[in-house]
Amino acid sequence: NRIGLVIDVSHTSERSSFDAIKYSERPIVISHANPIWWHPSKRNKSDILIKEVTSAGGMIGFSIYPHHLKDGSNCTLESFSTMIAQSADKYGVDNIGIGSDICQNQPDSVVEWMRNGTWSKEIDYGEGAKDDAGFPNQPTWFKKTSDFPNILDGLKKIGFNNEEALKIMGLNL
């Protein structure tokens, strides 16, 4: 806090995340994850944690990484946008955004290196698998960063007005 760094609990456990809220003098963020109530992924976050983060002035950035999405690579834009609308109702439109977690144009060797046991002393495939250790395919509506307008369209189609949609797309930061 002293030097103004943002504390991000996207990769931390529930307990560590609550400790960060408790000890931080400033709001913290979950920069790239989704609610467990939408998809029970290892890295997605509980409703209680998201409420604590957002009620303390922090925010959540919704992840487009397939392992964090309901139906994985087959997740629809409508499903993703509906989850965002439900989250806006729960946590407030001013406390949510997009945290894509996309690894565009990265070779599978990058994710394989991350999982090779450097930190855990053993290979950890995360939500991948030994026989499919590379990056999962992105959903059809978000293959690359130039597809962000698809999300804006999805938010408007689900009922967000232009001001709300633009907040979610980045103005909330």
Residue positions per predicted region:
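Active-site environment of divalent metal-dependent phosphoester hydrolases
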Residues: T12-F18, P35-W38, P66-K70, Q104-Q106
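Conserved, mostly hydrophobic/aromatic
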Residues: I7, H32, I60, D101, ...
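Short acidic/histidine-rich active-site segments
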Residues: Y91-W141
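A short alpha/beta connector and helix-capping loop motif
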Residues: I21-N34, R115-I123
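Histidine/acidic residue-rich metal-binding segments in metalloenzymes
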Residues: N1-V29, K42-G58, E78-D94
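A conserved active-site cap/scaffold subdomain adjacent to cofactor or substrate pockets
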Residues: T54-L77
